[in-house]
């Protein structure tokens, strides 16, 4: 459909494998695809109406996840599902991130990756915690519309604290790097 209806690419595609996939927004798109690596694809098309799509997927280069890769993939997928469940009229934009990042923090805690003595609540504390940010250095969502990061220039308090209303389109893109 995109080939026939698309206006062009919506933004520079991100295609990264191996260690490059750990670099947020790797747009050099260089490097080898090696057996056992994961491939991160982040691409979108701008349609004739000038709206832009944003799709991110992580795939095993050889077609099979290792056990460790599957464990992390499933955690990120669960975080995405939690974020999607939080998208509803009346919720705050930040509720989507909060739901997804809680799942990320719970997994990091279960895996023993949070500092000793740090529980999930402490990890999520916005003033004294944020321990999960070592592995997820970005927000979970952004509005999607005429720009791939629609409303990106809005004041932070108006954007993150904004109430979701019918008709809004947003992404839910948690990750672990």
Q: Which ranges hold each PLM region?
A:
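Active-site neighborhoods and metal-handling regions in enzymes and metal-associated proteins
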Residues: 1-177
């Amino acid at each position: 459909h995109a080939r026939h209806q698309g206006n062009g690419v919506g933004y520079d595609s991100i295609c990264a494998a191996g260690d490059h996939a750990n670099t947020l927004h790797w747009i050099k798109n260089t490097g080898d695809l090696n057996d056992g690596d994961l491939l991160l694809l982040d691409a979108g098309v701008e349609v004739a109406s000038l709206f832009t799509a944003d799709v991110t997927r992580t795939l095993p280069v050889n077609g099979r996840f290792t056990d460790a890769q599957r464990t992390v993939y499933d955690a990120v997928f669960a975080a995405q599902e939690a974020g999607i469940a939080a998208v509803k009229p009346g919720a705050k934009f930040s509720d989507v991130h909060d739901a997804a990042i809680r799942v990320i923090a719970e997994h990091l805690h279960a895996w023993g990756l949070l500092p000793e003595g740090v529980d999930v609540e402490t990890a999520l504390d916005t003033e004294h915690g944020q321990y999960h940010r070592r592995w997820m250095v970005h927000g979970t969502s952004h509005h999607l519309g005429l720009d791939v990061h629609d409303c990106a220039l809005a004041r932070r308090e108006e954007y993150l604290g904004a109430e979701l209303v019918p008709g809004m389109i947003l992404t839910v893109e948690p990750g672990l790097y």
